[in-house]
Amino acid sequence: MSTLLRQHAEQQFAEELHELKQNETNPVPENWEMSPQSVVTYLMGGKLKNGFEVSPKYIGNRRLMEIAVATLVTDRALLLYGLPGTAKSWVSEHIAAAISGDSTLIVQGTAGTGEEAIRYGWNYARLLAEGPSVGALVQTPVMKAMQEGKIGRIEELTRIGSDVQDTLITILSEKTLPIPELNTEVQAIRGFNIIATANNRDKGVNDLSSALKRRFNTVILPLPDSIDEEIDIVRRRVESFEKVMQLPAEKPALEEIRRVVTIFRELRQGATADGKTKLKTPSGTLSTAEAISVVNNGLAMAGYFGDGEIHAEDLVSGILGAVVKDPVQDK
């Protein structure tokens, strides 16, 4: 078993990716690892012709994944948009792993992200000693993706300042990255594209300019439609977490997962499941990702401070922490 706390998607699911490539029967775009159809099978799960079972990475509307993958065959970039905790980063990572075999070409967007994180930077010691040169140039993940024909990822695009966001316009429209200091440019090769993620809930985000919006095809990832779908997502992710962390606790009973998911869904909707009682909606999103965290925390509590079997009391503190984000508003 790997000692890594978290493997990249292409490492964790290497066997599945290998089997999909070995059983490929559809046309594969240049510099892609597999066909768009196989990428969707990798995301949604399924049984291959040789009987091999591919586990689902995304549980939800298959059509959304088909639209997302089809976008990346075109000249438009992909923007995964939605509430926090709707698997935007998870989907982005797995699409990049399936298409390029590399999900690590990533820029994490923050309020402090500058142009040099997207375009290129400089090794200032060499820049002062040699002046502008190829040796002094520091490549960014986006530049590497262009040169290698891979998928580049930008997380939390709307957290980046609007002026910095717009440095992507030339990259996405003309598929070139000018380097005027060296009187040259980097031209993207086939297979290159960008997957960006953004959420529509957090405060302090910067809206995309209309010019940049036109360069993206936006796919909105919703919260799970049904309670059974959400329970299945939580169960699968918790089982995966338990294997990695090797917690001294039994797998949580499905009923405990159902209890957490039901509480979260009722609070999100502002009413009990039967619709008879109205509830105050908290300030937090109470997403599926937070439900997973609550159950994981409950497992740790049960394993180290309980009898090894998860009970309601092991989940209470996690639920309280997820619900009460603002002590005043959520009182």
Name each region found by the language model.
Residues 231, 238-310, 314:
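Conserved AAA+ ATPase small/helical "lid" subdomain
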Residues 159, 214, 274, 329-331:
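Proteins with a high burden of low-complexity, intrinsically disordered sequence enriched in S/T/G/P/A and R
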Residues 35-36, 209, 224-226, 250-253, ...:
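General structural signal for secondary-structure boundaries
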